[in-house]
Amino acid sequence: MMEVKAIHRGARISAQKTRLVADQIRGLPVDKALNVLTFSPKKAAGIVKKVVLSAIANAEHNEGADIDELKITSIYIDKAASLKRFTARAKGRGNRIEKQSCHITVTVGN
């Protein structure tokens, strides 16, 4: 059984939001998964779609796989480093803002 990975490290979107999209396509054949991602209104769908397309290209180029038989065997989202920022508040105070990022790992196989 062949499995091929594609990883996007440091995607500038929170892991929580990205997992909502990842849960929808886990275990689907790649053509159905791409269809779901194409018509999803979420920002994370576009990012995950690029990683899925990269995994498909890796399978085709490196392993000579047939695209019609591929399915998403695993997809997981890990939390990555946060960018710490401050925003001004009233009376000279400041609040910390964390700009979240995540690592997206997609594995396709047959």
Curated annotation (Swiss-Prot):
InterPro entries the UniProt entry points to: Ribosomal_uL22, Ribosomal_uL22_bac/chlpt-type, Ribosomal_uL22_bac/org-type, Ribosomal_uL22_CS, Ribosomal_uL22_sf
Lineage: Bacteria, Pseudomonadati, Pseudomonadota, Betaproteobacteria, Burkholderiales
Keywords: Ribonucleoprotein, Ribosomal protein, RNA-binding, rRNA-binding
PROSITE patterns in UniProt: RIBOSOMAL_L22
A single Gene Ontology CC term: cytosolic large ribosomal subunit
Assembly with partners or alone: Part of the 50S ribosomal subunit.
GO biological process: translation
GO molecular function list: rRNA binding; structural constituent of ribosome
Function per UniProt: This protein binds specifically to 23S rRNA; its binding is stimulated by other ribosomal proteins, e.g. L4, L17, and L20. It is important during the early stages of 50S assembly. It makes multiple contacts with different domains of the 23S rRNA in the assembled 50S subunit and ribosome.
Protein's name in the database: Large ribosomal subunit protein uL22
Domain of life: Bacteria
Family statement drawn from the similarity comment of this UniProt entry: Belongs to the universal ribosomal protein uL22 family.
GN (gene name): rplV
Pfam families: Ribosomal_L22 (PF00237)
